[in-house]
């Protein structure tokens, strides 16, 4: 028997064994939501106890209750199919200036407060290991992203540009919770800074958005420098249950929140 069973199989087994008993409605909801996910997402979820999965999920959702209510959730799904309007601007953006914790590549950077404070945590940890982070890109307005995307289309053509640049309204940068670190080039991942961020970012709530080998899932080429702040609990949940792929977890959370109880 194949030892690599998916959570969905475990749920079906659980439901069959408890058919004559009162079933946890969250188990039934989990079954429906997982059936709606892509085959690749379902295949990424390891075998496990559905009730353990739900306990971890509820911990992540409880964390969301602490998010500010006057702005988008830190789990907000934005990608090629989900967008924000051209007028959306995160509330209370904080300027990201060069200081004793990090360097910057330009002087017009900013982040949502939650991401800013998480960057402080991440940067202090990096400094303790002898590394000073370089912050190269943060919040981008709809208009800024529009100009950037159009420039790339003119430079490389639409087909190629769409593989590495977001159309306006679909960029994580517009949410004010994403950072591009370092040189914004593939070789940055092999630098001391790049390796440190890759290995430690999740400890401080930062998740790699566009991993290598998942362009068909995320819609974008590998970007070793692009990290999104989602919080520590979500990073743990992502690693434990979604093969550490941010897109899978955010799609699941979006589907869960939209599904009927």
Where are these regions (language model features)?
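Positively charged n-region of N-terminal signal peptides that target proteins for export
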Residues: 1-4
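Bacterial N-terminal signal peptides
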Residues: 9-16
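Intrinsically disordered, low-complexity segments enriched in polar/charged small residues
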Residues: 8-9, 233
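Extracytoplasmic cell-surface/polysaccharide-interacting catalytic and binding patches
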Residues: 20-138, 142-261
């Amino acid at each position: 028997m194949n030892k690599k069973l998916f959570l969905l199989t475990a749920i079906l087994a659980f439901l069959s064994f408890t058919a004559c008993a009162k079933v946890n409605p969250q188990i039934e909801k989990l079954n429906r939501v997982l059936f709606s996910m892509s085959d690749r997402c379902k295949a990424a979820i390891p075998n496990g106890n559905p009730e353990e999965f739900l306990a971890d999920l509820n911990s992540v959702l409880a964390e969301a209750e602490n998010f500010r209510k006057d702005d988008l959730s830190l789990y907000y799904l934005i990608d090629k199919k989900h967008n924000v309007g051209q007028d959306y601007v995160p509330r209370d953006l904080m300027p990201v200036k060069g200081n004793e914790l990090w360097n910057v590549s330009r002087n017009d950077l900013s982040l949502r407060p939650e991401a800013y404070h998480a960057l402080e945590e991440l940067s202090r940890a990096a400094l303790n290991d002898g590394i000073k982070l370089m912050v190269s890109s943060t919040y981008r307005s709809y208009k800024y992203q529009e100009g950037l995307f159009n420039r790339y289309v003119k430079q490389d053509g639409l087909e190629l540009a769409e593989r590495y640049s977001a159309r306006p309204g679909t960029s994580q940068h517009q949410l004010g919770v994403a950072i591009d670190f370092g040189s914004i080039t593939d070789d940055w991942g092999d630098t001391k800074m790049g390796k440190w961020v890759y290995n430690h970012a999740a400890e401080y709530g930062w998740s790699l958005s566009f991993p290598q080998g998942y362009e068909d899932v995320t819609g974008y080429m590998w970007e070793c420098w692009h990290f999104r702040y989602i919080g520590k609990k979500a990073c743990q949940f992502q690693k434990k249950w979604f093969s550490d792929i941010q897109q899978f977890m955010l799609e699941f959370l979006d589907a869960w929140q939209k599904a009927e109880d």
